[in-house]
Amino acid sequence: MRTLWIMAVLLVGVEGGVIELTKMFVQEMGKNALTSYSLYGCNCGPGGRRKPMDATDSCCHVHKCCYKKLTDCDPIKDRYSYSWVNKAIVCGEDNPCLKEMCECDKAVAIRFRENLDTYDKKKKINLKLFCKKTSEQC
């Protein structure tokens, strides 16, 4: 029961189509987004944009900025479709906002893969108590 509660808390902190984003992470990197990134650094998971701790944390900052541009869909509730073709993510939505949401998630999955060498296990669970507000614009 405790494990289910912990997973529910982690799911709340991940924005976007949770199922889709998690699948993209596994396909791009072989990592689980929920267990590896949902509380990472100062920008991953719940909360506003803060000064990134490293390049991995910066990925979440950019992702939140991408979501901020969405106007006609809700990154928390809405779901989209995509396919995995020749080891590449292909967003396949007729709805322009859902397609853009898919593109945001695709971009962050690729960006995380490109920054795997900056991932610091010590920052995997950060309570964000010492994170500084950022002046970085989206």
UniProtKB/Swiss-Prot annotation:
Entry-linked Pfam families: Phospholip_A2_1
Spans annotated as Important for membrane-damaging activities in eukaryotes and bacteria: 121-133
Residues marked Cationic membrane-docking site (MDoS) (site): K128, K133
A biological process from GO: arachidonate secretion
Main location: secreted
Keywords: Blood coagulation cascade inhibiting toxin, Disulfide bond, Hemostasis impairing toxin, Myotoxin, Secreted, Signal, Toxin
Molecular function GO terms recorded: calcium ion binding; calcium-dependent phospholipase A2 activity; phospholipid binding; toxin activity
Cellular localization per UniProt: Secreted
Site (Hydrophobic membrane-disruption site (MDiS)): L127, F130
InterPro entries reported for this sequence: PLipase_A2, PLipase_A2_dom, PLipase_A2_dom_sf, PLipase_A2_His_AS
Cystine connections: C42-C131, C44-C60, C65-C138, C66-C104, C73-C97, C91-C102
Keyword Isomerase appears in the UniProt entry: no
First and last residue of the signal peptide: 1-16
GO CC annotation: extracellular region
Keyword field contains Signal: yes
Summary of the tissues where the protein is detected: Expressed by the venom gland.
Function: Snake venom phospholipase A2 homolog that lacks catalytic activity. It shows myotoxic and weak anticoagulant activities. A model of myotoxic mechanism has been proposed: an apo Lys49-PLA2 is activated by the entrance of a hydrophobic molecule (e.g. fatty acid) at the hydrophobic channel of the protein leading to a reorientation of a monomer.
PANTHER family in the record: PHOSPHOLIPASE A2 FAMILY MEMBER, PHOSPHOLIPASE A2, MEMBRANE ASSOCIATED
Family: Belongs to the phospholipase A2 family. Group II subfamily. K49 sub-subfamily.
Name of the protein in question: Basic phospholipase A2 homolog Ts-K49b
Organism: Trimeresurus stejnegeri
